[in-house]
């Protein structure tokens, strides 16, 4: 087993398969858990005894070996080792995966580490891992080149063939066309010939017919005959029947024949033309068809060539796609496989990715990325930087990238994922078992399928399912739908076991349930002393049972523990006496949840009481924030002697009187006690016995006892004591009787005498004795709550000063606490005890006189003032007038609303004044309110005056007031309105309490490693504290408890008030306040005190004492080891919750402020968010111009004007060549010599600008004007006027500044001051006082990192966040080697971001985003040096804080020195001096350790076996081993047990 005190750092990294196998005790091959009949684990299953160890101590599975004597034997029958069953909590198993599986954290994380390393997008990577896409894992470049060349050749051949084919086709077409055209010509010729022949025949017919008719006519002419019938020629009648034939008829005939011939000729020509036209048309058609065919062939050729070229290009492009790590779809894979077989390998799933990752050369990749970071810009540079960060993480950590892919899956021990039997016989099991079962089932099925050579698609699907099963086991729900169990509840994976409030970190490591604890309701214990609590007997008996049993055996009441247990269980009378004895030695711790600050757990001496409730001292209620309305508290018993000692010295209530947040007393009396003391110190004129005179205090008390004088009657008494300033009655000094003790005749009351007597303690020196003056001298004034608080504070402060303690008393303290206890601790113990006794006396006095005074009140004591109705009626009239004005249009509705609200607020205030005036000052109501015991004027106003205005749920004031009060009773509408505010209070309480708790948690996380580690960091820087109107606290309050950096002098007299390195005490603060009063306003504003601050502390880890100053809880300088970060976080967070709850108590009645604004503002400040209502800041320094444009747009323009001048003297005999006011450029001629041959150079302009001639000088003036313009919102209220001069970063509009913008404009110091002041504004406005230093601690943590801009010669990366001190260390080392340092800019981180970016991965992982933090830490191989508190609590070590830290440091250094001395002595003591020493001793002596850390490392690593062989501790061990034949123990090297006990 690893001993937790033997290491001081812890490293996290990726586990290799070999590591996982080395952890494992066997392979889990079956999904079975336990046998349903025998209820014993199944062999090789998830609970296998052979792998994980026996379920019963010292017994193997089969029962062959039983008892401890067989320890270590492995049973030959069942294979189970005989050992303790608790090994089942740490023995691991493993599952050998049939196929590699990716770890989901490194795939789905942001950013994806695997994706960045391979330069694959997370989406594509996921597709590969889940078998949706292929990734090319190997490429044969030679084969691919051959395929490419072959492809080009093939396409060349195809192209040539295609071209030849087209040429051939075109030739064929041309030949066919020429043949067709020749045939057409021949056909046309034939047609023409036939036409000619036809027309020749027709002509012949005409001629023949004409000749025949001519002859016939000639015959008829010859005989003068008449036509025997109509003579017709071709349809035309030449002669009708019986008409004589003459010559004219022949002429007519000839004419007709000519006409016929002409017609025939025309027809012939027409026919020939037609034939020709038809032939030409057909020819043209054939030609165009042929041309179109040729065109089509040409187009087809071009298209085919284009297609061929495209196909070639596509195929070549596809070949180009065959690149290593290319993601391709299944379809693309098939195409490429067909295209270029045997040239590449592609695969899918985690196995493919593992092959690729294992081949990555990290060194080469790192060089590439660094070159890209330096050469690129913008997004490319950003991406390269991200990749470089991951690559460098793997290089430096020694992790191998392929370990992100698992081949072996570890199985966690079975007792961490138990299976338990329930009452009904059913079993409840951890969800992890179901998740493991799914993995094993799928893994076994995959193995079987692979053995059977199943089809690829089935195997692939099974691999994907295995991947999903492992994903669900590691982080269920990170990808896809979460795996659900029975009842649809999401199964809890390993990641779920770690993260969140119920996770391992927060549930089991940072907070554990403890034994020896109990819980009960609390009741008040008015008779208890401050250090006591009442513990019920039954509870105490149970808590201290083992101790009582032991004591019973010791005393002989029982013979053994068993009988003693029976004795206790029967509750015999002797048990109570023994319990009383036992309990005397023990303190118990009381805790009230929620534990908001360290005073929520305090130690008390237990006082046995009857009953079942714990009794609590009334004065510690404020620290616990407890009341007695049913609150419960837990009791814990510190067991060890050291725990008891710590409880007695550190945690007992007596030593926790002051609040760590403010330094004010936290055990202030309240309620009944305040009322009793107030009643006691009140003087009532006219009371019985008023005006009587007494010679001494005893006389007056006697008179009171005999009823002669009322306790509040004003009487004259002679007292021998100092009277403190502030007396409210008359007094007269009398001569001292002994010349030392003062005597005064004062007007006072018997009550005040009783009160002042209670303040004195037995053995206190007399007033004036040896100059003794204490703040507990006679108080002759009214004492209320604030008076009692001041009294306790004064008492503590007075008794914590060494000069105020009598020598004998101081000597007693030394004897009691031991001479090793520091003076500061002694003073703290003494002051605390004295103050605690005083508080107890005041408590008793207050309770007694509150009871004797009989203070109570009834409804009749609450008197309604007579003027109330008149005020209300007058306000109603005012409101009517306002509404009339609005109806007339004189005012807007918003103005009407504001006026009405103002009128009612005024009325409420008037009535409040009247209520106060009508109250009887000696009445119980007035006394309770005035004294601060209970209630305030506002509540009395609601009871006796009027409730006033209330708010609605949005926070807006309802303008209808509640004019009634509780004495009179509310009407229905008034009651309804008042419920609005009341409900808002309750809702706020519920919502904001969670917010305040979460804020506290974040604050604790960010500041948990701020511990006081050194005395002085040696810084010369600090912060100025000046008078400021913005800061509500006074300079006096802000400087007390701080240490000066520089001397402080009085500006008037010049005297040095403080030297450097002086602690400023309360009296010094008052002195400064007096100095400030003596100065005028200007001098006050200039006067400042330069003090140390945690903001400027130079300590490498934690902070130094001087920068922190006073520990407010003790009133002394902080001790080394104090966890001031936690105190700061608690101090800020605790009042946040208080403020949250406070809205509820005012009943929702309208007040000016509400924490609803306050708490979100605090979160805004500490998270460094852009605030709501962001103010405009001046980006440059200059003069403001307010530009108002049309449409109401306002612009703020800042004009920065710089004037540069260049002045040149004009020598004699020089002529100016420029005019006055001319614009000139650099190098322009201004003047030259007018003497011929003069060798003097001309004057030229050295500056571009306007030139001015001034007698014997030439002046050039240049203006550099810079402008910046902002558009201002309509609603924004300006803080600047036109023409104002503003500085960079100055706020120009009302609102809150953006701290990030302020950091850029004004730098680190301005932001520190702004954040501190803004946080304080919120708290102080709510009446909560927190010391500045607590806020400064948080702000320091927010600003402790810087962002690298230029890495120089360092190994840092651009954009990396590093701690400022770490950067300074790295730069100093680089500069000393002659390199260039890194350049960085300050960064302001919100508390959440700052917590997560801490150096400790344990702290960050236990805060938020557990899986992301652990992923990053594992990849980087981060080392956690366990410097903070959380990380040490997580691993169970002592935290590096507390009073023992310094002693442990010294002890370690002494041990290192002792070992160094051992190693420096000769190896063989008997060797004479003359004999040369062995070779080993001739080496130089080891140097003693230089630092505490080095010494501690040495001490804690003595037996680890990890250090080098010549290490000084290794030598020491070797020497002791050689001398004594054994290894030295740790205590021998560290010192004796007694030394350790003294620590």
From Swiss-Prot:
It comes from the Bacteria. The keyword Transferase applies. Pfam families: RNA_pol_Rpb1_1, RNA_pol_Rpb1_2, RNA_pol_Rpb1_3, RNA_pol_Rpb1_4, RNA_pol_Rpb1_5. One of its GO terms (cellular component) is DNA-directed RNA polymerase complex. The keyword Nucleotidyltransferase applies. Its EC number is 2.7.7.6. Zn(2+) 2 binds at residues 1017, 1097, 1104, 1107. Keywords: DNA-directed RNA polymerase, Magnesium, Metal-binding, Nucleotidyltransferase, Transcription, Transferase, Zinc. Binds 1 Mg(2+) ion per subunit. Binds 2 Zn(2+) ions per subunit. Residues 1466-1490, 1522-1543 are annotated as: Disordered. GO terms for biological process: DNA-templated transcription. Belongs to the RNA polymerase beta' chain family. HAMAP family: RNApol_bact_RpoC. This is DNA-directed RNA polymerase subunit beta'. It comes from Herpetosiphon aurantiacus (strain ATCC 23779 / DSM 785 / 114-95).
């Amino acid at each position: 087993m690893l001993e937790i005190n033997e290491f001081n750092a812890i490293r996290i990294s990726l586990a290799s398969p070999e590591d996982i196998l080395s952890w494992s005790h066997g392979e889990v091959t079956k999904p079975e858990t336990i046998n349903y009949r025998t209820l014993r684990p199944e062999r090789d299953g998830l609970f296998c005894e052979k792998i994980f160890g026996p379920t019963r101590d010292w017994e193997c599975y089969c029962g062959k070996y039983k008892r401890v004597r067989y320890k270590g034997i492995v049973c030959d029958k069942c294979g189970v080792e005989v050992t303790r069953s608790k090994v089942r909590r740490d023995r691991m198993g493993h599952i050998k995966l049939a196929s590699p599986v990716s770890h989901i954290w490194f795939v789905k994380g942001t950013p994806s580490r695997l994706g960045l390393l391979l330069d694959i997008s997370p989406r594509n990577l996921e597709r590969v891992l889940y078998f949706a896409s292929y990734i090319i894992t190997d490429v044969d470049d030679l084969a691919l080149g051959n395929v490419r060349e072959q492809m080009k050749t093939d396409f060349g051949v195809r192209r040539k063939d295609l071209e030849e084919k087209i040429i051939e086709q075109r030739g064929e077409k041309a030949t066919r066309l020429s043949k067709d055209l020749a045939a057409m010509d021949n056909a046309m010729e034939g047609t023409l010939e036939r036409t000619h022949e036809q027309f020749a025949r027709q002509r012949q017919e005409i001629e023949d017919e004409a000749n025949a008719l001519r002859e016939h006519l000639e015959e008829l002419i010859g005989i003068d005959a008449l036509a025997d019938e109509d003579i017709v020629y071709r349809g035309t009648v030449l002669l009708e029947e019986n008409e004589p034939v003459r010559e004219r008829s022949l002429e007519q005939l000839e004419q007709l024949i000519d006409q016929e011939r002409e017609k025939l000729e025309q027809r012939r020509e027409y026919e020939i033309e037609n034939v020709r036209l038809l032939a030409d048309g057909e020819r043209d058609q054939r030609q165009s068809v042929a041309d179109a065919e040729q065109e089509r062939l040409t187009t087809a050729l071009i298209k085919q060539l284009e297609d061929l070229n495209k196909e070639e290009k596509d195929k070549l492009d596809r070949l180009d796609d065959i690149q290593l790590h290319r993601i391709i779809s299944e379809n693309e894979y098939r195409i490429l496989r067909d295209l270029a077989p045997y040239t590449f390998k592609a695969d899918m799933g985690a196995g493919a990715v593992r092959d690729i990752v294992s081949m990555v050369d990290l060194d080469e990749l790192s060089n590439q990325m660094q070159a890209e970071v330096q050469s690129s810009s913008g997004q490319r540079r950003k991406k390269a930087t991200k990749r470089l960060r991951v690559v460098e993480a793997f290089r430096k950590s020694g992790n191998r990238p392929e370990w992100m892919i698992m081949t072996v899956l570890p199985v966690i021990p079975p007792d961490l994922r138990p299976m338990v039997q329930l009452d009904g016989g059913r079993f409840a099991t951890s969800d992890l078992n179901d998740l493991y079962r799914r993995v094993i089932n799928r893994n076994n099925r995959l193995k079987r399928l692979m053995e059977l050579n199943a089809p690829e698609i089935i195997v692939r699907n099974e691999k994907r399912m295995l991947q999903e099963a492992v994903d669900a086991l590691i982080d269920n729900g990170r990808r896809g739908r979460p795996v659900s169990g029975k009842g649809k509840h999401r199964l809890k994976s390993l990641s779920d076991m770690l993260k969140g409030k119920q996770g391992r970190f927060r549930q089991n490591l940072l907070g554990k349930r403890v034994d020896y604890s109990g819980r009960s309701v609390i009741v008040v214990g008015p008779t208890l002393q401050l250090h006591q609590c009442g513990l019920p007997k039954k509870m105490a008996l149970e808590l201290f049972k083992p101790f009582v049993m032991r004591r019973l055996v010791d005393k002989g009441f029982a013979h053994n523990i068993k009988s003693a247990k029976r004795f206790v269980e029967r509750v015999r009378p002797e048990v109570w006496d023994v319990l009383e004895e036992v309990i005397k030695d023990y303190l118990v711790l009381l805790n009230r949840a929620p534990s908001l600050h360290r005073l929520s757990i305090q130690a008390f001496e237990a006082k046995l009481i009857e009953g079942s409730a714990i009794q609590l001292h009334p004065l510690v209620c404020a620290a616990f924030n407890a009341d007695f309305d049913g609150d419960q508290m837990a009791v814990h018993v510190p067991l060890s002697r050291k725990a008891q000692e710590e409880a007695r010295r550190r945690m007992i209530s007596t030593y926790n009187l002051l609040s760590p947040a403010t330094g004010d007393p936290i055990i202030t009396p309240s309620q009944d006690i305040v009322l009793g003391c107030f009643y006691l110190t009140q003087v009532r004129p006219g009371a019985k016995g008023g005006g009587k005179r007494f010679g001494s205090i005893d006389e007056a008390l006697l008179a009171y006892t005999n009823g002669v004088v009322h306790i509040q009657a004003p009487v004259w008494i002679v007292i021998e004591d100092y009277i403190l300033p502030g007396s409210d009655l008359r007094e007269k000094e009398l001569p001292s009787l002994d010349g030392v003790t003062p005597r005064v005749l004062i007007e006072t009351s018997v009550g005040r005498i009783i009160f002042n007597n209670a303040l004195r303690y037995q053995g206190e020196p007399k007033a004036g004795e040896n100059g003794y003056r204490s703040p507990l001298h006679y108080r002759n004034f009214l004492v209320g709550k604030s008076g009692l608080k001041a009294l306790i504070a004064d008492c503590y402060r007075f008794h914590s000063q060494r000069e105020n303690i009598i020598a004998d008393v101081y000597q007693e303290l030394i004897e009691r606490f031991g001479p090793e206890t520091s003076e500061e601790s002694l003073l703290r113990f003494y002051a605390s005890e004295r103050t605690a006794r005083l508080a107890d006396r005041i408590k008793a006095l207050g309770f007694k006189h509150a009871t004797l005074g009989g203070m109570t009140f009834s409804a009749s004591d609450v008197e309604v003032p007579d003027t109330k109705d008149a005020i209300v009626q007058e306000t109603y009239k005012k409101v009517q007038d306002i509404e009339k004005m609005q109806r007339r249009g004189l005012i807007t509705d918003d103005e009407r609303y504001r006026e009405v609200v103002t009128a009612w607020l005024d009325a409420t205030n008037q009535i409040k004044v009247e209520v106060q005036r009508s109250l009887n000052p000696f009445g119980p109501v007035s006394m309770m309110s005035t004294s601060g015991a209970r209630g305030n004027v506002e509540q009395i106003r609601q009871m006796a005056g009027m409730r006033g205005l209330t708010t609605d749920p949005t926070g807006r004031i309802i303008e209808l007031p509640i004019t009634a009060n509780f004495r009179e009773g509310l009407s229905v509408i008034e009651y309804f309105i008042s419920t609005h505010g009341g409900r808002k209070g309750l809702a706020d309480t519920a919502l904001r309490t969670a917010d305040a708790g979460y804020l506290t948690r974040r604050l604790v996380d960010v500041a948990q490693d701020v511990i006081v580690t050194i005395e002085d960091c040696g810084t010369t820087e600090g912060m100025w504290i000046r008078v400021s109107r913005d800061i509500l606290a006074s300079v006096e309050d802000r400087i007390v408890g701080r240490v000066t950096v520089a001397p402080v002098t009085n500006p008037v007299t010049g005297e040095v008030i403080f030297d450097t390195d002086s602690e400023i005490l309360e009296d010094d603060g008052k002195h400064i306040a007096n100095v400030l009063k003596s100065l005028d306003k200007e001098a006050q504003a200039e006067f400042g005190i330069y003090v140390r601050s945690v903001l400027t502390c130079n300590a490498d880890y934690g902070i130094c004492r001087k920068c922190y100053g006073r520990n407010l809880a003790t009133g002394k300088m902080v001790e080394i080891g104090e966890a001031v970060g936690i105190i700061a976080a608690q101090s800020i967070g605790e009042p946040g919750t208080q403020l949250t709850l406070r809205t509820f108590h005012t009943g929702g009645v309208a007040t000016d402020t509400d924490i609803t604004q306050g708490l979100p503002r605090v979160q805004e400040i500490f998270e460094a968010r852009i605030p709501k209502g962001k103010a405009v800041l001046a980006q440059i320094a200059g003069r403001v111009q307010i530009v108002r444009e049309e449409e109401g747009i306002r612009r703020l323009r800042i004009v920065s004007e710089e004037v540069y001048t260049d002045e040149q003297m004009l020598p004699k005999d020089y002529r100016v060549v420029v005019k006055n006011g001319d614009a000139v450029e650099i190098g322009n001629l201004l003047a030259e010599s007018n003497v011929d041959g003069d060798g003097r150079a001309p004057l030229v302009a050295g500056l571009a600008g306007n030139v001015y001639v001034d007698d014997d000088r030439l002046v050039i003036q240049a203006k550099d004007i810079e402008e910046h313009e902002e558009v201002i919102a309509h609603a924004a209220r300006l803080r600047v006027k036109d023409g104002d001069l503003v500085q960079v970063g100055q706020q120009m509009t009302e609102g809150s500044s953006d701290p990030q913008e302020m950091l850029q404009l004004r730098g680190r110091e301005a932001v520190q001051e702004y954040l501190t002041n803004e946080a304080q504004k919120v708290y102080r406005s709510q009446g909560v006082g927190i010391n500045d230093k607590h806020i400064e601690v948080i702000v320091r943590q927010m600003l402790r990192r810087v962002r690298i801009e230029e890495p120089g010669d360092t190994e840092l990366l651009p954009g990396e966040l590093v701690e400022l001190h770490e950067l300074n260390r790295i730069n100093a080392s680089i500069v000393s080697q002659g390199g260039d340092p890194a350049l960085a800019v300050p960064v302001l981180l919100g508390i959440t971001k700052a917590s997560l970016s801490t150096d400790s991965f344990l702290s960050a992982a236990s805060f938020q985003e557990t899986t992301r933090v652990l992923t990053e830490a594992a990849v980087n191989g981060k080392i956690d040096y366990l410097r903070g508190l959380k990380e040490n609590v997580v691993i169970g070590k002592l935290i590096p804080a507390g009073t023992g830290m310094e002693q442990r440091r010294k002890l370690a250094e002494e041990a290192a020195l002792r070992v160094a001395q051992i190693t420096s002595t000769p190896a063989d003591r008997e060797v004479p001096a003359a004999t040369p020493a062995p070779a080993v001793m001739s080496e130089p002596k080891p140097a003693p350790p230089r630092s505490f850390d080095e010494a501690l490392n040495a001490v804690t690593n003595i037996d680890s076996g990890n250090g080098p062989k010549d290490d000084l501790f290794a030598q020491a061990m070797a020497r002791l081993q050689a001398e004594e034949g054994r290894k030295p123990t740790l205590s021998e090297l560290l010192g004796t047990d007694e030394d350790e006990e003294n620590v």
